[in-house]
Structures are given as structure tokens and as C-alpha cells.
Regions:
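Positively charged n-region of N-terminal signal peptides that target proteins for export
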Residues: 1-4
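N-terminal "domain-start" segment that seeds a small globular fold
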Residues: 21-47
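Short, internal strand/loop/helix patches
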Residues: 89, 104-138
Length: 188
């Protein structure tokens, strides 16, 4: 009898799990999700409040090799457009102890938060690492990009779209990054 009850319970739990509502994936034109998270200084990042002031680029990312190579382009995007009112918020999946060293070596200038449980990915309806969501002033999703491009193409395209939202001149993000790169000297 116990085996029948356990078997029935397992069958029902699998059935309910399979029919549970998945988080809906966002599309361009959708309202941005309700999103709040504390940054690494303990200050609340509230997407709705930020989007009232101007466009916000939310980047859900990690410190993997591809994301790491792409990071300078997003830092350049942040620097290029912050005076235009565009905010960049990066949410990293790393735990505190691993991230502290990473943040120090990368000299991050954008606002960032940590979410090792990846709740932010669920809120934005994605499992892709990294994922970027450009939210226009007022809170509508203006652009979405998923995946990584260490050449900076994703950051440049998002930067161009963000510039268009605030009617600003486009900045050549790649040129900014190339200008800041230190020359590599061969070892003897």
C-alpha cells in the first residue's frame, strides 16, 4: 500500500511540475518586469524608478571568458552614454567571495549587483548567459540580445539603439575600447 501511495505521489508531483507555468520570455514592446535588487554597496536598484528618468540597459552576465572579453565594450558603452541619461546595470551570477577580486581587477564603473541564485534571469524570462535588455524611458523593452560576442558587436548595436532612444550621436564603442587597450609586448 505504501508503494502505491508513494508511486501516486511521485506521478502527481511530476505531472504538476510539467504543467507549471514557465516564466514568460520577454519580447520587444513588452512592459519591463518589476525588478529590484541591491547593488554591492547595499543600495536598491529599482528598474521602474530608473526607467522613469531615462533608458536602462540591464545586463545579466557572469565572469566567464566570453563575457569577460565582452565587458570592456559594455564599460565603454556606459562611459559614452551616461551623460545622455542612459544607465547600465550589470547583474553578475558570481558569489560575493569570487566577485570581489574580479570587480577590483576590472575596475567596474557601472552599477552592479550579484545574484548567484540567478533570480534575475527568471524575472526576465531567460536562461541565456549573458542576456541584455534595453528598457526605454517609461518602461517598455526596446531591445533584447542574448549570447556573447567578444568582438563587442552586441554592445555596439545596443549602444546605437540606446543613442537613438535619447537622440544622441552614436559613439564608436570599438574605437573607445581599442584606444584604452594596452599594447601587448612579446616576451623574450
Amino acid at each position: 500500500m505504501k508503494k502505491i501511495i508513494v508511486s501516486l505521489a511521485l506521478t502527481l508531483s511530476v505531472a504538476f511540475t510539467a504543467t507549471a507555468e514557465p516564466t514568460k520570455a520577454l519580447k520587444v514592446g513588452d512592459d519591463a518586469p518589476e525588478f529590484k535588487i541591491k547593488d554591492t554597496n547595499g543600495k536598491e536598484i529599482n528598474l521602474a524608478k530608473l526607467a522613469k528618468k531615462g533608458p536602462v540597459l540591464v545586463r545579466l552576465t557572469c565572469g566567464c571568458l566570453g563575457c569577460d572579453r565582452e565587458l570592456p565594450y559594455f564599460q565603454a558603452l556606459h562611459e559614452a552614454y551616461k551623460k545622455e541619461g542612459i544607465r547600465l546595470v550589470a547583474v553578475f551570477a558570481e558569489p560575493d567571495e569570487k566577485f570581489a577580486k574580479y570587480a577590483k581587477t576590472k575596475k567596474l564603473k557601472m552599477q552592479y549587483a550579484l545574484d548567484p541564485k540567478k533570480n534575475s534571469w527568471q524575472i526576465f524570462g531567460t536562461k541565456t548567459m549573458p542576456s541584455n535588455f534595453l528598457i526605454e524611458k517609461g518602461g517598455k523593452v526596446a531591445a533584447i540580445s542574448k549570447g556573447c560576442d567578444p568582438s563587442g558587436l552586441i554592445a555596439r548595436n545596443l549602444g546605437d539603439k540606446a543613442a537613438k532612444l535619447v537622440k544622441a550621436n552614436k559613439v564608436d564603442i570599438k574605437a573607445q575600447v581599442d584606444k584604452n587597450k594596452k599594447p601587448v609586448t612579446p616576451k623574450k
